[in-house]
Amino acid sequence: MAAVTPTVPEFVNVVVSDGSQDAGLAMLLLSRPPTNAMTRQVYREVVAAANELGRRDDVAAVILYGGHEIFSAGDDMPELRTLSAQEADTAARIRQQAVDAVAAIPKPTVAAITGYALGAGLTLALAADWRVSGDNVKFGATEILAGLIPSGDGMARLTRAAGPSRAKELVFSGRFFDAEEALALGLIDDMVAPDDVYDAAAAWARRFLDGPPHALAAAKAGISDVYELAPAERIAAERRRYVEVFAAGQGGGSKGDRGGR
């Protein structure tokens, strides 16, 4: 992998394979040391990066990564403490847009989680299709410790994965929990040695680099619709996507067409 694309200016990079190996593999890299704390600017850059990755025809699968040391410690609390109620509402909207943008990337996505995934960092990881964690990672829905609650659809995503009782306990307490518990709760899908996190995520993503892009995008959107649409609307959307994918395959475009909504 090579060639950082400087389309997002400061804290979030899009890194796309140069084609020498793993053609089609890309990375959305959080880069705000030391903890990848999330500010309004970081969220805006996440939106821009996710949208770019969704559009690019040279991208087939995406790794969401915060680097070797830490995924994200969540929201930047010093910034939050300076906000008025109106500004906090705007910040919550931007946070939601970032999480939604990652979830809407019409390609397989995997979060490679190192160090800590706390608060909004955990929510962002839950927006990926698959999550690989180091066995030393600490997780937490920690917003309550600052007198807040998860936003960015964080409580819904946590509840879908862990169930309502477990989600309430985690949110009410804000406690840290380890990767083994995260795996048991269904919040992560694989647990590996800390030095193997990125490689394990890349191995998962490689499985789909040669897949039919239009069909993968349609399948991803259809599964997401299970939680988002009423049954009749969901079934109609599924049927529409099936016909679109069928037509793309008939036209010989199964590899070249990208999209799904």
From Swiss-Prot:
Q: List the disulfide bonds.
A: none
Site annotated as Important for catalytic activity: where?
143
Top EC class for this record: lyase
Pfam families from the UniProt entry: ECH_1
Q: Which GO terms describe its molecular function?
A: enoyl-CoA hydratase activity
Question: Its catalytic activity?
Answer: a (3S)-3-hydroxyacyl-CoA = a (2E)-enoyl-CoA + H2O; a 4-saturated-(3S)-3-hydroxyacyl-CoA = a (3E)-enoyl-CoA + H2O
Q: What Enzyme Commission number does this protein have?
A: 4.2.1.17
Question: Which InterPro entries did the record assign?
Answer: ClpP/crotonase-like_dom_sf, Enoyl-CoA_hydra/iso, Enoyl-CoA_hydra_C
Q: Which GO terms describe its biological process?
A: fatty acid beta-oxidation
Q: Can you name a GO cellular component term?
A: plasma membrane
Q: Which UniProt keywords apply?
A: Fatty acid metabolism, Lipid metabolism, Lyase
Tell me which PANTHER family the record gives: (7AS)-7A-METHYL-1,5-DIOXO-2,3,5,6,7,7A-HEXAHYDRO-1H-INDENE-CARBOXYL-COA HYDROLASE, ENOYL-COA HYDRATASE-RELATED
NCBIfam families in alphabetical order: PRK05869.1
Question: Which protein family is it in?
Answer: Belongs to the enoyl-CoA hydratase/isomerase family.
Q: What does this protein do?
A: Could possibly oxidize fatty acids using specific components.
Name of protein:
Probable enoyl-CoA hydratase EchA17
Q: Which organism is it from?
A: Mycobacterium tuberculosis (strain ATCC 25618 / H37Rv)
Give the encoding gene's name.
echA17
